[in-house]
From Swiss-Prot:
The lineage of its organism: Bacteria, Bacillati, Cyanobacteriota, Cyanophyceae, Synechococcales. PANTHER family: RIBOSOMAL PROTEIN S7. Keywords: Ribonucleoprotein, Ribosomal protein, RNA-binding, rRNA-binding, tRNA-binding. Part of the 30S ribosomal subunit. Contacts proteins S9 and S11. GO terms for biological process: translation. The keyword Membrane does not apply. Disulfide bonds: none annotated. CDD domains: uS7_Chloroplast. This is Small ribosomal subunit protein uS7. GO terms for cellular component: small ribosomal subunit. Belongs to the universal ribosomal protein uS7 family.
């Protein structure tokens, strides 16, 4: 472990196009090999498709989707006397949002065919309607935490 001080957390600036911090975080999650403009185009195309299909504000739908996918608890491995327990722990809001964005991007990428914008739009709309793989992943995480509730006293 480093002997120096922990790196200071930089504030996330709002996205210039949508004036939204979550959108900016999503662009960073979508980005591959430093190609930020490509990631921004994918997100804006996805928002365009959402607006086309639903007729509602894509930013509102996006925020709802992220809220529906954000986990409240997770399990973490804790070693106690030779045994490893899955200990349920609360998720800080920042980490929860990061996990939600990661899941949305990963499950969008694993969807079949079409462009990334279409896949992302589909996953976001599913998540906003409490369906889709990202929401299922959150439910799975919560079930794991519930199943291991007996080890909650090992929290650290």
């Amino acid at each position: 472990m480093s002997r120096r001080n922990a790196a200071e957390k930089r504030p996330v600036l709002p996205d210039p196009q949508f004036n939204n911090r979550l959108a900016s975080m999503m662009v960073h999650r979508l980005m591959k090999h430093g190609k930020k403009s490509t990631a921004q185009k994918i997100l804006s195309d996805a928002f365009g498709l959402i607006n086309e299909r639903t007729g509602s504000d894509p930013i509102e739908l996006f925020e709802t989707a992220v809220k529906n996918v954000t986990p409240l608890v997770e399990v973490r491995a804790r070693r106690v006397g030779g045994a490893t327990y899955q200990v349920p722990m609360e998720v800080r809001q920042e980490r929860g949002i990061a996990m939600a964005l990661r899941w949305l991007v990963n499950f969008s990428r694993s969807r079949n065919g079409r462009s990334m914008a279409q896949k992302l739009a589909g996953e976001l709309m599913d998540a906003a309607n409490e369906a889709g793989n990202a929401v299922r992943k959150r439910e799975e995480t919560h079930k794991m935490a519930e199943a291991n509730k007996a080890f909650a006293h090992y929290r650290y």
